[in-house]
Regions:
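Short inter-helical turns and helix N-cap capping residues of alpha-solenoid HEAT/ARM repeat scaffolds
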Residues: 7-8, 38-39, 68-69, 99-100, ...
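Structural detector for internal amphipathic alpha-helices that build alpha-solenoid repeat scaffolds
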Residues: 2-3, 9-24, 33, 41-55, ...
Length: 175
C-alpha cells in the first residue's frame, strides 16, 4: 500500500483499478484518502473503486465524512449517493449545514439523489443559501422529490438572473 502513498500517479491509478473488491479497513481508508489526491485522475479512480466496491463498506464511507478535507467529504458524499447508501442519510443531513459551500452542495445533492424526504425542510431552506451552487442542488432536489415551494421563494429565486436556475424554476412550475 506504500504505492498509494508514495507512488507516481500512474502507479496509484494502476493499484486503485485493482482494489474495487477490498473490504480491508486499512486499504479502504487509504482509498478514501486518495479522494484528496493532488491528481484528478487518482481522485477519479479512487471514486470509481469505492462506487464499484460490492462489499458492505458504508461504515468506512460514513467515517470518511468526518475528514477535515472538503474533497474527501464531498467525494464521499457522492460515493454514498451513487451506492444508494440510505443508511447514511442522518450523517449527510448534518453536513447540509456545513460552513463550506462545496460540502453543503454535495450533501444537498446526495440527499436529493437518495430521495431523502426527511430532508424536505433543508432543501427548502437551502433554496436561499448564500451559494448559487447550493441553491441549484436544492432546487433540483425539490423538483425531483415533488416538494411544493412557496411563491415568495420562487420570486426570490427569479431575481437570481441565472440561466440554470431559470431552467430549473421552469421545470418546477411545470410539475
Amino acid at each position: 500500500m506504500k504505492v498509494l502513498e508514495l507512488g507516481s500517479c500512474e502507479e496509484k491509478i494502476k493499484i486503485l483499478e485493482t482494489l474495487d473488491y477490498t473490504n480491508n479497513p486499512e486499504i479502504l481508508e487509504s482509498i478514501i484518502s486518495k479522494l484528496d489526491d493532488d491528481d484528478i485522475q487518482v481522485r477519479g479512480e479512487a471514486f470509481s473503486s469505492l462506487v464499484l466496491n460490492k462489499n458492505k463498506i458504508s461504515n468506512f464511507l460514513i467515517k470518511g465524512l468526518n475528514s477535515a478535507s472538503k474533497n474527501i467529504i464531498g467525494f464521499t458524499l457522492l460515493v454514498l449517493a451513487n451506492r444508494n447508501e440510505t443508511i447514511a442519510i442522518p450523517e449527510i443531513i448534518k453536513l447540509a449545514k456545513d460552513e463550506r459551500s462545496m460540502v453543503r452542495e454535495c450533501a444537498i445533492g446526495a440527499l436529493g439523489y437518495l430521495k431523502a424526504q426527511e430532508a424536505k425542510e433543508i432543501f427548502l431552506k437551502s433554496l436561499l443559501d448564500s451559494n448559487l451552487e447550493v441553491r441549484k442542488s436544492a432546487l433540483q432536489a425539490v423538483i425531483d422529490l415533488n416538494i411544493t415551494v412557496s411563491e415568495n421563494k420562487i420570486k426570490e429565486m427569479i431575481k437570481e438572473k441565472d440561466s440554470e436556475i431559470e431552467k430549473l424554476l421552469f421545470q418546477l412550475k411545470k410539475k
